[in-house]
């Protein structure tokens, strides 16, 4: 559980009036702000704070969502010949829908250049 605190009494003057997030499960403290001696976002063992007195401060904890350098995969289950035929004879494929950048799109609504690009990107000889 995460608890927000403001240190009101400490042997270390750098800790006085500083704000921290205490993680009781990990027995760690994350510095939110301190006058000196501790960097913002620095994580230390609670024992490193020493003998302190504090008051709790309200903290709203939201689930953390991080996306860093994620991958995206579009899956189109069809044959190259089907798409090539759809370029030549669009009237035969009015409902042909593919995935492009996470969106479903009718193949015939794409420009000829976009259609060629989809075919080239979807069907490669090797990775």
Swiss-Prot record:
What GO terms fall under cellular component here? Answer: cytosol
Q: Which residues form the Glycine radical domain?
A: 5-127
MF GO annotations: formate C-acetyltransferase activity
Report the residues modified as Glycine radical.
Answer: 102
Record-linked SUPFAM superfamilies: PFL-like glycyl radical enzymes
Q: Which InterPro entries match?
A: Auton_GlycylRad_Cofactor, Form_AcTrfase_GR_CS, Gly_radical, Glycyl_radical_cofactor_GrcA
Its protein name is Autonomous glycyl radical cofactor
**Organism, scientific name:** Shigella dysenteriae serotype 1 (strain Sd197)
- The gene it comes from is grcA
Q: Which Gene3D superfamilies match?
A: 3.20.70.20
> Which residues are reported to carry the modification N6-acetyllysine?
48, 88, 92
Question: Which one Pfam family would you cite for this protein?
Answer: Gly_radical
Query: In UniProt terms, what function does this protein have?
Result: Acts as a radical domain for damaged PFL and possibly other radical proteins.
Per UniProt, the keywords (alphabetical) are:
Acetylation, Organic radical
């Amino acid at each position: 559980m995460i608890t927000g605190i403001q240190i009101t009494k400490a042997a270390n003057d750098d800790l006085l009036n500083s704000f921290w997030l205490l993680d009781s499960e990990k027995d760690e403290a994350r510095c939110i702000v301190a006058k000196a001696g501790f960097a913002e976002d620095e994580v230390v063992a609670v024992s490193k704070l020493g003998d302190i007195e504090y008051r709790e401060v309200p903290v709203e904890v939201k689930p953390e969502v991080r996306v860093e350098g994620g991958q995206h995969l579009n899956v189109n289950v069809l044959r190259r010949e089907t798409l090539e035929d759809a370029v030549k004879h669009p009237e035969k494929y009015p409902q042909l829908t593919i995935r492009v950048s996470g969106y479903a799109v009718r193949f015939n609504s794409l420009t000829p250049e976009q259609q060629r690009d989809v075919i080239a990107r979807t069907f490669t000889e090797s990775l």
